[in-house]
Amino acid sequence: MLTQLINARILTPQGWLKDGSVLIRDGKILEVTNCDLAVIGAQLIDVKGMHVLPGGVEIHAHGGGGRDFMECTENAFRGAVQTHMKYGTTSIFPTLSSSTVPMIEQAAETCTRMMAEKDSPILGLHLEGHYLNMAMAGGQMPENIKNPDPNEYIPIVENWHCIKRWDAAPELPGAMQFGKYITGKGILASVAHTQAEFEDIRTAYEAGYTHATHFYNAMPGFHKRREYKYEGTVESIYLMDDMTVEVVADGIHVPPTILRLVYKIKGVERMCAICLLYTSPSPRD
């Protein structure tokens, strides 16, 4: 089936294209052009100046629509995912905060089952914790926070292949071994809820930690201890040229001036925006 969107405001790598046209065949984009002449045989859809842009890939969200992925049930997952689908997201990595092993296993079972469905928007499970620095716990559940334990994480990784990302504080005992192990299994290791300094970050990067979770949040920046000044986690991550970062781009978690700084240093290829949505009715909240 051939479909043509006309009178669209289209986001392209070169910027916004006004009064453009998108030609689609069987769900695949064939052409984006500033010519909105009707194509013979195409079903015309006049979007009347509305925005047309690529679907969002949400890499860090804890829930939505009044549901939390930590409920671990299929109903909770569906409710949250469907909420994201209403607002431009087309695929998602459901995120768990620091959890117990039974919670992780239940969520992983739900995730695995739903990923097997035709055209599933779920790309994998993201574990934010529970190997985090207690001093930087923030909104995490402190009773679940601990140091990396291979007797715990190895069986989880071996049994549940839906896990695609796991966050940790690299300064913790055992964190380097953890990073090397999970990256060897194809899981993204990300720095999170941490007090890591430059040597910690440099060593972590070499051990496989290539991403930073909600950059600037739950991690220190430049600081002073007595008469000496030290770089923080933030500056250390900037110095890792190929390390990617995610930012909560709501203007509250990170102010607009800092967002511009992140963009200026990391560039569009090494940063992304996340919504970090919990159980709010919609991302707008």
Spell out what each predicted region is.
Residues 75-76, 107-110, 149, 227-232:
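Charged helix-capping and loop-helix junction motifs
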